[in-house]
Each structure stands twice: as structure tokens, then as C-alpha cells.
């Protein structure tokens, strides 16, 4: 999927704006408050039904207006997408004039957004890292959502029994949660391993290898949520009384995490903020490469305020990385760092001065 066009009506500071995007690299620049983040927010909303800035979509309606609308065109499948939000009404999502769900939106228009609240995956919560992994599985594996819901339904039932203070009827749920948990774990681990392969390929394409030594030092481990020297059913059975005391299920795929270490130390304690951000970008790109190569899915990478946290060295690595990627990339910055000479070296590059779009 690559967005070809985006039309904004009464969305934040944009009264009526139409943008033609490149299927490759798109760069938005302008001073603070010009609307850079709002444009990226609109693109993300078109691919998820959610804003990465506000949980209140009504706040996105331009001041003095009763609704906002976003329209976009997908170059790969020819889909016409319309997203509308009226005051005091639910969001309306149409694909080719047919009402659809946010689940289909995420699957048909996949994207990942990196912004100031999520720029470091190493510093994020385990829940956030699980969501990034699970979202890629959701868009690439039609059976994953069924597995995911089945596991979490079992988890809810088991936790309900634990909170009641009785484990007399817990055995059937131990069996069921273990069956569903093993399926969920297998899918996660397979995608994680594929992402590692693509990550190493991306790192090896960077010519200034001395500048990325820190990337080679990072050890990345997938923790399934329990000690896999034992089967999950054994963990559930052996943990019954401990879980009863804590009134919740203490181990399982709902506790899964991706851990980033240097030696035996958490990477966030060693890496600079710029190095953490660059690594997060690489990790997202690696996941997108798995989607593209193994599932023929082209996801869009959205990066707000690219220069924030990055120094000259890490920014130069990012520029080098751009030419190795095949998916659509949309990012913003306060200043224009791209001369005509640099622009000509990129594939399908488009640059937008945001003040001129309003």
C-alpha cells in the first residue's frame, strides 16, 4: 500500500488541502506550528482510524467547524478511502464508498508511526513492543486475530476465577489457555526471527560501518512470557497457587517482550537517545521488509520530527538508509536538510513546504 493522494478538509489547521504523495520518499518541513505533525497525523489516521496525538478525535476538527474529512487514494489496490468525523458522532470509514471497520483499515492500509512519545522502542513498555509485533502479524496472517482473541478470552476467564478466590474449576482454562498461548507464541517467534534477518541485512547495507558499531553490539531477544524449558500447561498448573495469591495470571504470552541488551545491560542505559531512535527506525523498517518480501504487503513508515534526538552522525546514517528501502516513507522536520544534489540521489523523492500547503 502507498498513499498517492491525501485531501484534508477542516482537519486541525487545514481548511482544504490536497497533496499528491510519492510512493517512495516524502519529506514535509516547516516551522513549529505550521502543521507538519497534523499532516502525518492525518495519514496515520487514514491507516488506523486513530490519532497518534489525541484519543479524542473530536479535537481534530478545525475550530468553528462541525466535522473533518480525509480522503486518500491507494496506488497499489486502487482503493478510495474516506474518513469522516462529525461532532458527537462516531468516526465513519468508507472504502470505495462501502462502510468498513478499523480492523480492515489497519489490514488494508498498514503503517507504523514513530513520534516523540514512541521514538525509543528500547525505552518503551513491553506492552508497546508487543503491539508493534502483533500489528505486523495482524496485517499479514488472517488467522492471527482469531488466535489472539482466543488466548485473551481464556486469560480473562482464568483471571476471573483467580479473582473469585477459587481454583476448583481452573483446569479446563489452564488447558485451553495453554493451547491458544502456544499457537500465539509460535507466530510471534517466527515473525521476530524473520525481522532479525532483515535487520541484519539493513545494517550491513550501511557503508559507514564504523558509525554503526553500536548496532552490532545490541543483543535482541524474544521473551515469550514464560520459561520455555517448561511447556505452558506445566507453567499454568504449577503457578495456580501463586496466581491465586496475586489474583492474576503471572506468566504467558500476555507477558511477552522483545528485549534489547548490550552485554547483560538494558540497551537504553547505554545508547544515546539518537542511537535509540535510529535503532527504532531500523527495527520498523526490518518488520516492513518482512511484510513486503514474505507477504507482498507494502507498509508506510511515518516519522514525525526526524531530526529530534538525532545528531549529525545518526542523521547521515538515516539518509543512507533511505536509499535501501522499498516502501513508502513519510517524515517531517523543522528545517529543509535536502539540497537539490541530495534530492537527486533518492528514489521518487518529494518535498513539501508545509506553510505553502495551507
In which residue ranges do the predicted regions lie?
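A short, compositionally biased
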Residues: 1-2, 63-68, 85-90, 253-258, ...
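Conserved NTPase motor "head" modules and their coupling/switch loops across ABC/AAA+ ATPases, GTPases
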Residues: 1-31, 168-300, 309, 313, ...
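Conserved P-loop NTP-binding catalytic core
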Residues: 11, 15-94, 165, 169, ...
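Nucleotide-state sensing region of NTPase/ATPase domains
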Residues: 47-128, 137-140, 144, 200, ...
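An accessory alpha-helical subdomain
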Residues: 79, 120-209, 223
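Walker B catalytic acidic pair
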Residues: 304-306
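H-loop/switch region of ABC-family ATPase nucleotide-binding domains
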Residues: 332-334
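Conserved P-loop NTPase catalytic core
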Residues: 352-358
Amino acid at each position: 500500500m502507498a498513499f498517492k493522494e491525501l485531501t484534508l478538509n477542516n482537519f486541525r489547521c487545514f481548511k482544504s488541502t490536497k497533496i499528491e504523495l510519492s510512493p517512495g520518499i516524502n519529506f514535509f518541513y516547516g516551522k513549529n506550528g505550521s502543521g507538519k505533525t497534523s499532516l502525518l497525523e492525518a495519514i496515520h489516521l487514514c491507516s488506523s482510524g486513530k490519532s497518534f496525538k489525541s484519543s479524542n478525535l473530536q479535537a481534530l476538527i478545525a475550530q468553528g467547524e462541525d466535522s473533518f474529512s480525509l480522503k486518500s487514494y491507494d496506488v497499489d489496490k486502487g482503493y478510495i478511502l474516506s474518513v469522516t468525523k462529525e461532532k458527537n458522532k462516531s468516526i465513519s470509514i468508507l472504502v470505495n464508498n462501502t462502510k468498513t471497520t478499523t480492523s480492515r483499515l489497519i489490514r488494508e492500509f498498514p503503517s507504523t508511526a514513530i513520534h516523540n512519545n514512541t521514538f525509543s522502542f528500547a525505552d518503551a513498555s513491553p506492552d508497546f513492543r508487543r503491539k508493534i509485533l502483533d500489528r505486523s502479524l495482524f496485517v499479514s496472517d488472517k488467522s492471527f486475530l482469531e488466535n489472539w482473541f482466543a488466548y485473551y478470552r481464556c486469560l480473562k476467564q482464568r483471571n476471573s476465577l483467580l479473582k473469585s478466590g477459587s481454583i476448583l474449576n481452573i483446569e479446563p482454562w489452564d488447558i485451553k489457555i495453554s493451547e491458544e498461548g502456544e499457537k500465539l507464541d509460535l507466530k510471534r517467534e517466527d515473525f521476530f526471527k524473520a525481522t532479525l534477518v532483515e535487520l541484519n541485512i539493513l545494517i550491513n547495507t550501511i557503508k559507514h560501518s564504523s558509525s554503526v558499531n553500536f548496532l552490532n553490539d545490541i543483543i535482541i531477544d524474544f521473551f515469550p512470557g514464560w520459561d520455555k524449558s517448561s511447556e505452558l500447561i506445566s507453567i499454568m498448573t504449577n503457578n495456580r497457587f501463586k496466581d491465586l495469591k496475586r489474583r492474576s495470571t503471572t506468566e504467558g504470552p500476555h507477558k511477552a517482550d522483545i528485549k534489547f541488551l548490550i552485554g547483560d545491560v538494558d540497551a537504553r542505559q547505554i545508547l544515546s537517545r539518537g542511537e535509540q531512535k535510529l535503532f527504532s527506525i531500523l527495527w520498523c523498517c526490518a518488520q516492513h521488509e518482512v511484510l513486503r518480501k514474505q507477504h507482498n504487503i507494502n507498509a508506510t513508515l511515518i516519522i514525525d520530527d526526524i531530526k529530534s534526538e538525532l545528531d549529525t552522525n545518526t542523521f547521515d546514517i538515516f539518509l543512507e538508509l533511505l536509499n535501501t528501502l522499498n516502501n513508502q516513507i513519510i517524515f517531517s522536520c523543522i528545517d529543509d536538510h535536502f539540497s537539490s544534489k541530495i534530492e537527486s540521489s533518492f528514489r521518487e523523492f518529494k518535498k513539501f513546504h508545509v506553510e505553502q500547503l495551507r
